[in-house]
A protein has these predicted regions:
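Hydrophobic beta-strand-centered segment that forms part of the acyl-chain substrate-binding groove
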Residues: 62-113, 128, 135
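Short hydrophobic alpha-helix segments
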Residues: 130-132, 148
Length: 163
């Protein structure tokens, strides 16, 4: 039996790279170096390591831009910051030795979740984009909880600054 033809989900167009000049001036960015240990034998960034870099950028964003310790929320407040979904579009491979710029934008803030748009740029070319849905949970009950007010306020202020 032949495999069914794969199509994009209804309502989802093929993603195209965005030039960084269209990112908001106040958007938070960080630089990550692609190291030997991040790559497959061909010297191309291994996809799971790309996801690790995205998570590292989010952790850094919390402290550097929101002034809220990611690890404090998890360790001290017992608030989980789990990913409900991560939808990544890869436009070009990332190679060993390259410096990648990760830009984080807030698309939407809900009651229990926030949607991030994370853009990875090499020089002036977007090579990857990830739409990341993060849900706040109680690490005691493992159920979704309302985003804590200080976090929601910080996310809202950042989102507003990027308009």
């Amino acid at each position: 039996m032949p495999l069914p033809k794969l199509e994009l989900p209804k309502g989802r167009e093929r993603a195209l790279p965005i030039h960084p000049r269209y990112f908001p001036d106040d958007a938070w960015t960080t630089i990550r170096m692609v190291r030997f240990s991040d790559c497959d034998p061909a010297g191309i960034l291994y996809t799971p390591r790309f996801v690790d870099m995205i998570n590292g950028a989010v952790e850094d964003f919390f402290l550097a831009r929101l002034h809220i310790g990611y690890h404090d929320l998890i360790q001290n407040e017992r608030i989980g910051l789990g990913y409900k979904s991560a939808d990544c579009d890869f436009f070009k491979p990332a190679l060993m030795g390259e410096r990648l710029q990760f830009t984080i934008l807030v698309e939407h803030i809900g009651r229990t979740s926030v949607i991030f748009s994370i853009h990875c740029v090499r020089e002036i070319e977007e090579i990857m984009r990830c739409r990341l849905v993060m849900v706040t949970t109680s690490l005691n009950t493992h159920n979704a909880i309302t985003i804590p007010r200080p976090l929601k306020d910080a996310l809202t202020a950042y989102k507003d600054s990027c308009r």
